[in-house]
Amino acid sequence: TGEKPFSCSTCGKCFLDRSHLTRHQRIHTREKPFSCSVCKKCFLDQSSLTRHQLIHTADKNFSCLECEKCFSKQSSLVSHQRTHTGEKPFSCSECDKCFAFSSELIVHQRTHTGEKPFSCSECEKCFSKQSSLTRHQMIH
């Protein structure tokens, strides 16, 4: 039916099931309880950690013809190749600015929406990018 009965008390976004809501809420709390035993990088959920761990264990059968960098997934190679080609397939519907990576578009769109999902635990100041919060936290 498309009903999404589980809603986030912080931002109001709704979800089909409780597990998706729980994962989403970690965005607001910055909780990343799943840690890579190799490099210590942390993740919101087990599936993201499992996917990440491939970079440490999987065969890297996909290599870039430009720089010979190797990847375990073809999608990672395709994404990397944009650094050489300059291709920017992700465009903003508000201003038509284009980006090479979907993550860059998501961050950019916050300039239009005003969304600031990263908040300082010391002073409550909010930021649109994690890197801006990290830089800010150095003043405390």
Curated annotation (Swiss-Prot):
GO terms for biological process: regulation of transcription by RNA polymerase II. It comes from the Eukaryota. It is found in: Nucleus. One of its GO terms (cellular component) is nucleus. SMART domains: ZnF_C2H2. Keywords: DNA-binding, Metal-binding, Nucleus, Repeat, Transcription, Transcription regulation, Zinc, Zinc-finger. GO terms for molecular function: DNA-binding transcription factor activity; DNA-binding transcription factor activity, RNA polymerase II-specific; RNA polymerase II cis-regulatory region sequence-specific DNA binding; zinc ion binding. InterPro entries: Znf_C2H2_sf (IPR036236), Znf_C2H2_type (IPR013087). Its main location: nucleus. A zinc finger (C2H2-type) spans 6-28, 34-56, 62-84, 90-112, 118-140. Belongs to the krueppel C2H2-type zinc-finger protein family. May be involved in transcriptional regulation. PANTHER family: ZINC FINGER PROTEIN, ZINC FINGER PROTEIN 771. This is Gastrula zinc finger protein XlCGF71.1. It comes from Xenopus laevis (African clawed frog).
